[in-house]
Regions:
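Detector for small/aliphatic-rich hydrophobic stretches
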Residues: 1-82, 86, 96-100, 193-196, ...
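Conserved RecA-like P-loop NTPase ATPase core
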Residues: 38, 54, 130, 149, ...
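Conserved beta-strand segments of the P-loop GTPase G domain that flank and frequently precede/overlap
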Residues: 53-55, 83, 105-108, 130-134, ...
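Conserved strand-to-helix beginnings and helix N-cap segments that scaffold or border functional pockets
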Residues: 63-67, 115, 142-143
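Conserved inter-motif catalytic segment of the P-loop NTP-binding fold
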Residues: 77-128, 137-140
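Short, hinge-like loop/turn segments at secondary-structure boundaries
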Residues: 98-100, 122, 148, 172-177
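A contiguous pocket-lining binding segment that forms or flanks enzyme active sites
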Residues: 126-166, 171, 179
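Phosphate-binding/switch region of NTP-binding enzymes
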Residues: 160-230
């Protein structure tokens, strides 16, 4: 009897209420970042439902790190909500993404309104993902968004500097993006289904040092290369 019930529950047409997403084998669905070292450390990627925290400065490459995850969420054809919270979200970058048509940018005047808008987007069940920029996030607020996002099958990404959050936040993944003179790293302060790790090397679109700028100046420093820029 128990085997029959288990088989029935796993049927894709059976609604399982507030249960978060599972794969066909009963495991939790995880979305890979497309970074081999990071995906291995995160037990395959970020859980498809729930909240994750990225401790990074805006424009540090956090969106490129998320790109593969957002592409997978966009396959649901639901909305992706962006809450830049008074930060400038480059429309040129947005127009070049495959999920541009699904993306809505919501402007708010303060962080309290941004968090309220985030909760409403989750509850609407019309959104597959919410990306919210904050100056800081309290553990209690992060926990609230984690519970709501798992309940309504939504991925919430919290991007914040992290200076005022010394401990790990109660979310699926709490990661920090950092670099030294030669390499970019991710530090995992918390990860569901695996252990925290430090100094996970990743491929990053931004150079960790200014060597790329130096090489560019050196390349175009000759008179033949700069002739087209000369005026008389």
């Amino acid at each position: 009897m128990s085997a029959s019930i288990s088989s029935l529950i796993k049927h894709p047409l059976v609604f399982r209420g507030r249960d978060h997403r599972h794969s066909n084998d009963g495991g939790e669905v995880r979305l890979p970042f497309g970074q081999a070292n990071l995906d291995k450390a995160c037990a395959g990627g970020v859980p498809a439902a729930g909240a994750m925290s990225i401790r990074a400065l805006a424009g540090q490459g956090e969106l490129q790190l998320l790109n593969n995850v957002l592409l997978q969420k966009a396959a649901t054809q639901k909305r992706i909500i962006w809450l830049p919270n008074q930060l400038y979200l480059n429309p040129n970058w947005m127009s070049q993404t495959p999920y541009q048509q699904q993306s809505w940018v919501v402007s708010t005047s303060n962080e309290a309104d941004a968090q309220w808008a985030c909760e409403q987007a989750i509850r609407s069940q019309a959104c597959c993902c919410v990306v919210m920029y904050l100056a800081q996030i309290a553990p209690k607020a992060a926990r609230r968004l984690q519970v709501l996002a798992r309940q309504y099958d939504c991925l919430v990404v919290l991007v914040h500097p992290g200076y005022r959050s010394p401990g790990a936040l109660p979310v699926n993944i709490d990661m920090e993006l950092s670099f030294d003179t030669q390499q970019w790293f991710v530090h995992l302060h918390r990860v569901s289904g695996a252990w925290p790790q430090q100094h996970i090397t990743i491929e990053h679109p931004l150079p960790a040092a200014n060597s790329a700028i130096v090489n560019a100046f050196r390349q175009y420093s000759s008179s033949s290369a700069t002739a087209i820029h000369e005026v008389s």
